[in-house]
């Protein structure tokens, strides 16, 4: 992982620094020490935008934006590429020596989630369809603090765990502190739910005024701005927060090189389950894990060589009728059903109320 961080810095990733120029570290829930490098309150965005800028410089890479993977091309448990749908709705078959699935998680299946709504577990559906092994599909994590809103259709806005790592306090309806804010996510989520039930409220309060103003402004500008847009001034008052689905620790089973049970098919990021997070991921570990295991996948593919069996690939592609995928809505319904079957409406790291709301939404 130190090499990955060095790579990012060399690409221009702008991580926070101390006065002496060394990397600054913050702390989040269940971490024993300050060990997390960061960029304001949008570290993930900084990493992805930096990597994307580097990719755009590569002459041997073709970026196809607004393009959706509809299915993989496979024959005899070997992947030969993917079927894609372009922005204008046209379908194409793309062959490849190796295919990597990086489809995100399952948050779009839940009523309350920090994920984008289009992340509905398509990789799980494709895996089930083609007999690719899955692992721990019930390992779904709840984040303790997202901004409370009555608009259920919106993506829940994350109030970063590092806010609590820097000193923010959680308060009940009477503005009394009721919990250790740096408990592991599952434990803290349970405590918040218990307090909400006790108070008869839909949220608890988070007070950021315990953080020095300069630190708030430099570290959490996006949170400050979002709260302002929602009518709250974090410098003068607490904000309402509530737990929501956040991260999928299960997924397509992969080995330590991110290879799936299907030959020439890899999976990375939230799509994959390599087991390193166990049942309850530590905050921010997923960013580094995604990069480390993606780099391992790339390294193995380069080592094995990019040689495609054109005859076998042709047989695989010829067996596919694109007309089977012409009804986009029908494909979406099929994949949502398969993804739902994969996770079975389960959610292991949360509370009874969250489980019931998740299952109710999935079954709707």
Where are the regions a protein language model picked out?
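Conserved redox-cofactor binding core of oxidoreductases
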Residues: 9-90, 102, 146-150, 170
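Glycine- and aromatic-enriched mobile tails/lids
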Residues: 7, 16-27, 31-34, 164, ...
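Glycine-rich loop(s) and the adjacent beta-strand/alpha-helix scaffold that form part
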Residues: 98-151, 157, 287, 291
């Amino acid at each position: 992982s130190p090499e990955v961080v060095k790579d990012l810095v060399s690409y221009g990733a702008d991580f926070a620094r101390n006065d002496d120029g060394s990397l600054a570290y913050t702390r989040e829930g269940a971490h024993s020490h300050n060990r997390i490098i960061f960029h304001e309150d949008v570290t993930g965005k900084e990493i992805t935008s930096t990597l994307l800028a580097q990719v755009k410089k590569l002459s041997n890479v073709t970026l196809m934006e607004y393009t959706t993977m509809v299915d993989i091309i496979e024959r005899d448990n070997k992947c030969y590429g993917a079927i894609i749908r372009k922005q204008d709705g046209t379908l194409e078959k793309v062959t490849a020596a190796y295919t990597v699935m990086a489809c995100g998680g399952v948050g779009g299946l839940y009523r309350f989630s920090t994920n984008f709504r289009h992340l509905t577990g398509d990789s799980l559906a494709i895996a089930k369809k083609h007999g690719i092994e899955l692992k721990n599909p019930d390992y779904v994590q709840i984040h303790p603090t997202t901004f409370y809103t009555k608009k259920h259709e919106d993506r829940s806005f994350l109030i970063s765990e590092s806010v609590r790592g820097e000193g923010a306090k959680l308060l009940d309806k009477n503005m009394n502190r009721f919990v250790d804010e740096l408990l592991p996510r599952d434990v803290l989520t349970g405590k918040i739910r218990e307090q909400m039930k006790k108070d008869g409220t839909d949220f608890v309060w988070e007070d950021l005024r315990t953080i020095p103003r300069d630190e708030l402004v430099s570290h959490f500008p996006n949170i400050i701005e979002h709260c302002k847009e929602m009518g709250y001034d974090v410098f003068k008052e607490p904000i309402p927060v509530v737990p929501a689905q956040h991260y999928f620790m299960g997924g397509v089973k992969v080995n330590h090189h991110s290879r799936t049970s299907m030959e020439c098919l890899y999976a990375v990021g939230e799509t994959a389950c390599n087991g390193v997070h166990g049942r309850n991921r530590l905050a921010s570990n997923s960013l580094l894990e995604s990069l480390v295991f993606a780099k391992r996948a790339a390294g193995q593919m380069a080592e094995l060589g990019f040689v495609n069996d054109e005859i076998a690939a042709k047989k695989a592609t010829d067996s596919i009728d694109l007309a089977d995928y012409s009804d986009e809505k029908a494909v979406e319904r099929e994949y949502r059903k398969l993804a739902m079957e994969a996770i079975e409406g389960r959610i292991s790291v949360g509370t009874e109320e969250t489980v019931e709301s998740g299952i109710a939404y999935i079954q709707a």
